């Protein structure tokens, strides 16, 4: 069937061409019928590598499409647009004669085909697989493709002859029309799963969609830096290829960091240069002065000579013992604090100095130093504070005199309790604080009783700024520096303990102070103290005593009678004495009272004792921990002891904190009948009142008339 069809088509094409044929074209048209069977195998072997390359890089074009490529290509003068050839047109299996004729007759057409094919840019299936499938499904297309193959071999080559006439163009147009119709018939047998012709330009393949999605993800801009991963990887690869470092995979992270750092740029929109010094470097620069040796600036040589040898405590030794107890600040920070305390003792006339502890804050922390000035050194500062208070009181009195007189109020405010003098009670020691070692030390003001009373009713976190306001209810009289000083006084009074017998009262001053104020407020070290066994300090709380005075409910360590009056007032009110004005004197726990007498907190002991090590008890130390003030610790090795606090400065409370209830409303002015409002009378009451008044008037008139009559009778 194939052999009969192809000569017939060949004959029809020869008749259409007519006179355009040349003598040598007839030979090429007739010779393949007899010469090809002998040379088909060598030609196929020669064509194999070329067709294999073409199938990988171009569409699976059938011989039919190859025959019309010169007509529909860009070189054709008559065609304005390419022929509507399907990119996935099914290819039929050509006869053994077709490959040979294709190589002999149309080598330039294959070149044109390969030049047009890459413009599509769409992957296509293997032409061998497609042709095998179509050979099974559409056998009737084989004859058509073979016929077109013979036509392709018999067509004249105008580019070889260099001549084109009208008849040749007409024949080409007819052949093109015939091929188009034949392609439409062949396209109708397409598989439904294959995409439509020209669909690659409208609907991209799944591979292209995946690539586009991946690239879009890499191009996603970061919300923090404003860069994307695609550009970052491109810059990294460019840097690696330009520099070509050894073992690039090992320094890949460093290269990434260098590329990111290259994008950083300074801001030039500021009027002044920005200070890029970090707080860590700033404090490091200040701490350099702590490590300098020699004479400090602003310190007299005479003052250095007068400083006592025992003014500076051995903080590192105390830190060594607290480290065994599992408490401390670390060696580095402790040594910096040690140097900061040395700077404090070198610049102030301090007789005794002690590292009190560290109070934590929200923004910054407080390092607290407890000092005691030498005799007569702190009097000038106390006098300046008293002068400032008197000045404030004088200004307030002057303002009161200038104001208009108002109705006198019967409310009497409670008398302000004065603060304790320096070196006594809650103001026995002076406290310096700083936020970091190396920063300047700031002296805290003395505490007043009202601040301690209000501090017991509120609970505030420290910020680390001494000038920060304290917003609370009840209102606190002062800022954060006053609140810090009040909390330090409370913590010291409740947690500073020592082994029993380490301190003793003075023999001479003890009786006088006890008679005068009802208690002793001073003590001294016992030179005959031989120490207590560590195991005894752990087993019994009676071997620990308080060596700081207890603070009374009025905010003082020594009782102050707020009802004391002047002699004139006492003489005037001797006749009218009221028992309600009498307030019983409050007496706190005396000094050196054992801590075993401390009250429990809802069945929780106020103190917890333990050994620093149960594995080596013969070298362990006794550790005492406060449950009332979390963060307060004390240690003792039998002869030495030390107290230390690190915490937020809050007292333990079993219940959640609740602000106090506002006090009841006081009666500001007395209410009498002259200002008391009465209800309006009713009509009946008004009538009864008028009748009563009329009756009274009538009775008065009758009495007057009777008196007049009696007088007239007397004259007669």
Swiss-Prot record:
Keywords: Cell projection, Ciliopathy, Cilium, Cilium biogenesis/degradation, Cytoplasm, Cytoskeleton, Disease variant, Kartagener syndrome, Phosphoprotein, Primary ciliary dyskinesia
CDD domains, per database record: DD_CrRSP4-like
GO BP term, example: cilium movement
Cellular location(s): Cytoplasm, Cytoskeleton, Cilium axoneme; Cell projection, Cilium
Biased composition (Low complexity): 29-42, 54-66, 80-100
Role description: Component of the axonemal radial spoke head which plays an important role in ciliary motility. Essential for triplet radial spokes (RS1, RS2 and RS3) head assembly in the motile cilia.
Subunit text: Interacts with RSPH6A.
Protein name per the record: Radial spoke head protein 4 homolog A
Biological source species: Homo sapiens (Human)
